[in-house]
Amino acid sequence: MKAATAPLFNAIADGPPKAHGYWLTTKDNLRIRVGHWRSDAAHGTIFLCPGRTEYIEKYGKSARRLVENGFDVLAIDWRGQGLSERLHKDTLLGHVSEFSKYQIDLDTVMDWAESAKLPGPWFILGHSMGGCISLRALHKHERFLAAAFTGPMWGINVVTLTRSAAWLIAKTGTLMGLGTLYTPSTKAESYCATADFEGNTLTNDRAMWEYMRQQLIEHPELQLGGPSLRWFHRALRETRQLARLPSPKQPCLCFLGSNEQVVDVERIKNRMAAWANGELVIIEPGEHEVLMEAPKVYNSILDRICTHFDTHQSKTMLSRDDAESKGENRQT
């Protein structure tokens, strides 16, 4: 699969030194960006799926820790955000026509990773909206050996509206052709670039807040504002559909901040209670972005994720060796 060189601002990312950005073209002819941080002795690849408004560079520090643990890392700019192709003339509008389009983005990155012969096995790590996309992907693909999530968007915390009212506004606005209007209470500005640290819903750590804020100030082309009504409606619909599905068979480790205010906490708890080989870990104290808390916190989370992936890689290898041994015994 063809790929062209794309910018990756590793100076603001503070990521591992072996960093490369690539442009990929999806099957519906959109240009998206992928970032690849390479380990010298990788024993697997982690597909890092960011949330809404996010971009590759935001996960530089996370990638550094994952690479130190022996993994290659692929981070994705979803269509409509980061440096990937924007979908509306108002480039600050967070918009998508259907959530299934994000699966096209992920499929494109997987195809490229296959053609580039990135090391297996493959794992998936999804945050917020990326957690929603990743959960859908686990139902579609056998390729991912295990999964991890942080603050996954398996439901949206509708603060100022009841859920039924939120559905009504989102659906009616979309049907009336108003799908590209901003969702009520949101606007055409980046939250992290404009909000104050005090009272923010993302992190308790001021240094990490400034890390994110400075990235957006130095590269304003990475900024994204509020979601469109259509995005909001499609997000409500996708999370409802996912909630009705059984849990995937892959092992899962999920982290949730104790003061989560962005996504639906009950949806996460219900999902993890029904995930046979899943574990939910509450980070105390923690906001929505637990990987953007203090270094001691996020490094501990990332180390635990790597142990989770390594453990299930080892179990798979042992099972495979045992199956091969039994097959040889049958032949003798």
Positions of PLM-derived features:
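Conserved alpha/beta-hydrolase
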Residues: 56, 63-89
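Short beta-strand/loop motif that positions the catalytic acidic residue
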Residues: 248, 254-256
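Alpha/beta-hydrolase-fold enzymes
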Residues: 129, 133-219
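An N-terminal hydrophobic leader/cap segment in hydrolases
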Residues: 1-25, 30-37
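Catalytic active-site module of serine/aspartate enzymes centered on a nucleophile-bearing elbow/loop
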Residues: 279, 283-332
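Short alpha-helix in the alpha/beta-hydrolase fold that links the catalytic acid
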Residues: 250, 264-273
